């Protein structure tokens, strides 16, 4: 039985602006002395942050593509990072289990490291801006099988959530306040961190069906949660209340009446699409990849999903139903990461084969451009929120900026 049936995609961009595909490298930024593992643009796109094997976090200015700050203090590889949705701070966590908070304007560390996890950190998630416009709380997951809730203003751990029987590999903090965690124990758990049961938090439900560990989670609202109140061409909100209102409006528009959708990807070569707020029964099981699924991402408008696999392919699926739409072939090594343009019209993929490929949703079967230049595997990848550039980070210790 073949799952490679090709279906015509009726693509209609919902974005108010059009992103042109990136076609060339305009800058190779050096400074890291080991592999660049993590790469992320700030919500307003004005800064880029990178982290990796050299234990340093670096901030880069995206208008001049020059280094701004080098932040040292980590005592092991920087494994995961995230921006606050208002861009005020950047959080990084390492293999020793320490979490550090940085002021991107000055490059200085804010407060003391957050310690308490017994093993390395696997993921960090901020509480959404429309739930807390002051961006005070983060959740972290670890190889120690726990989730911790921290107040980054006070530096205190507010809660430790237990229940998984294996390392927690991925984490999301959803727009309704629920936390989703995927684990080596083959389950996804849905938590209410402010639950009113006897314990401070409560397990809402457990989602089962995968035959192997969960590698990746994605929400259909990831993009709007990440960018908060920032909208290209609109002035920045003047107050936290205004920011909260705009962030809520953006969230509501993307999830619509259908609600939040969660996608899980696994070592078992499959994905499941869920309505995690209301049901433990999956909407759909997504079959077709021939190897483990490494990364998944909803398009910013929530209508599509891209998945990257060790089978060297990127696949496109319907974000509402989970229906298979297209296979993007061309990479000759495992696909480590995928990223969407802000208008949901293009995808970039980074691979073990040392290339970045650009794909168009109008005709996704063949890569629009192949961007060579890295001397080794491409681990980190992000498309700037304003759509003007893509950043890639590699085992070759460089960060490359690609432009149209």
Residue ranges and their predicted role:
Residues 57-60, 99-103, 124, 147-150, ...:
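WD40-repeat beta-propellers
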């Amino acid at each position: 039985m073949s799952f490679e049936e090709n279906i015509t995609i009726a693509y209609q961009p919902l974005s108010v602006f059009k992103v042109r595909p990136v076609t060339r490298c305009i800058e190779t930024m050096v400074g890291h002395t080991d592999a660049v593992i993590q790469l992320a643009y700030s919500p307003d796109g004005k800064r880029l942050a990178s982290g990796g094997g050299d234990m340093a976090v670096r901030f880069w200015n995206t208008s001049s593509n020059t280094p701004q700050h080098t932040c040292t203090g980590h005592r092991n590889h920087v494994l995961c990072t995230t921006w606050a949705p208002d861009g005020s701070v950047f959080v990084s966590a390492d293999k020793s289990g320490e979490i550090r908070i940085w002021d991107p304007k000055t490059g200085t560390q804010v407060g003391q490291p957050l310690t308490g996890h017994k093993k390395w950190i696997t993921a960090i998630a901020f509480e959404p801006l429309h739930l807390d416009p002051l961006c005070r709380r983060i959740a972290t997951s670890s190889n120690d099988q726990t989730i911790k809730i921290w107040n980054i203003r006070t530096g205190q751990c507010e809660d430790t959530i237990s229940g998984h029987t294996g390392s927690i590999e991925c984490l999301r903090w959803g727009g309704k306040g629920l936390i989703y965690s995927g684990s080596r124990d083959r389950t996804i758990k849905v938590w209410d961190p402010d639950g009113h049961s006897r314990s401070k938090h409560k397990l809402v439900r457990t989602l089962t069906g995968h035959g192997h560990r969960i590698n990746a989670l994605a929400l259909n609202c990831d993009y709007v949660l990440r960018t908060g109140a920032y909208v290209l061409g609109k002035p920045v909100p003047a107050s936290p209340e205004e920011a909260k209102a705009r962030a809520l409006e953006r969230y509501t528009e993307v999830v619509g009446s259908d609600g939040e959708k969660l996608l899980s990807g696994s070592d078992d070569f499959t994905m499941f699409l869920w309505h995690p707020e209301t049901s433990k029964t999956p909407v759909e099981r997504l079959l077709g990849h021939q190897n483990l699924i490494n990364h998944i991402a909803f398009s910013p408008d929530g209508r599509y999903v891209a998945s990257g696999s060790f089978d060297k392919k990127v696949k496109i699926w319907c974000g509402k139903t989970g229906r298979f739409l297209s296979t993007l072939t061309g990479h000759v090594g495992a696909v480590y990461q995928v990223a969407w343009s802000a208008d949901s019209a293009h995808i970039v993929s980074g691979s073990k084969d040392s290339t970045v490929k650009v794909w168009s949703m109008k005709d996704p079967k063949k890569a629009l451009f192949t961007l060579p230049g890295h001397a080794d595997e491409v681990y980190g990848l992000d498309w700037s929120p304003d759509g003007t550039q893509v950043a890639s980070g590699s085992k070759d210790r460089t960060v490359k900026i690609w432009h149209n």
